[in-house]
């Protein structure tokens, strides 16, 4: 039996929504700011599907994910269809010159593992990792925006 655990984090990015959206929606670039994501490959014959590989230390997980909903500058929602069970959404909120990015991730954990591990401990690790990912994304966006300004 699998139990689902869900975590949400958000951050404000001092950049316009169009830039924030365009950088996040380029899924294959995610390993640049998500340290546990080793690779993302969008399938050429079906761009709604992508292969993901998560690796850290001695463990590695992979899964195939399908985009369930996409609304430009607002939301990308996904669910795994094979491999590591997970689902979630990334939401974007326009703050007229800045953007709020909210990431919600849910993942399936075997019930026996929940009993062994402290759910709160696991949750704190996941949320701190996701928050660090959003902070790296914010820094990535700011660096790209700065390069664009210097190029003009």
Positions of the model-derived regions?
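Short beta-strand segments that buttress and anchor functional surface loops
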Residues: 50-56, 76-82
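Short, cysteine-centered beta-strand-loop-beta hairpins and adjacent loop/turn segments enriched
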Residues: 55-62, 109-113
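Hydrophobic pocket/interface hotspot
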Residues: 20-24, 30, 50-52, 67, ...
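Hydrophobic-ligand-binding modules of eukaryotic lipid transfer/binding families
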Residues: 1-12, 52, 98, 131, ...
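Short, surface-exposed coil-to-beta transition loops
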Residues: 6-8, 60-64, 85-89
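Beta-strand/loop substructures that line and gate deep hydrophobic ligand-binding cavities in soluble
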Residues: 80-132, 139, 148-152
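A short, structured loop/turn motif at beta-sheet edges
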Residues: 14-17, 44-46, 69-73, 91-100
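Hydrophobic ligand-binding cavity/cleft-lining segments
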Residues: 1-45, 139, 152
């Amino acid at each position: 039996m699998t139990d689902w655990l869900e975590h949400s984090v958000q951050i404000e990015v001092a950049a316009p929504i169009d830039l924030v959206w365009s950088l996040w929606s380029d899924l294959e670039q995610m390993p640049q700011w998500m340290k546990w994501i080793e690779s993302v490959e969008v399938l050429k014959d079906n761009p709604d599907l992508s292969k993901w590989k998560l690796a850290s230390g001695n463990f590695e997980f992979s899964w195939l994910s399908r985009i369930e909903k996409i609304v430009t500058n607002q939301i990308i929602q996904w669910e795994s269809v094979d491999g590591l069970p997970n689902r979630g959404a990334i939401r974007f909120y326009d703050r007229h010159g800045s953007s709020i990015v909210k990431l919600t991730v849910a993942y399936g954990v075997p019930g026996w593992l929940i009993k062994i591990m402290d759910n709160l401990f696991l949750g704190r690790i996941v949320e701190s990792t996701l928050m660090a990912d959003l902070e790296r994304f914010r820094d990535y966006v700011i660096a790209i925006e700065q390069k664009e300004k210097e190029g003009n």
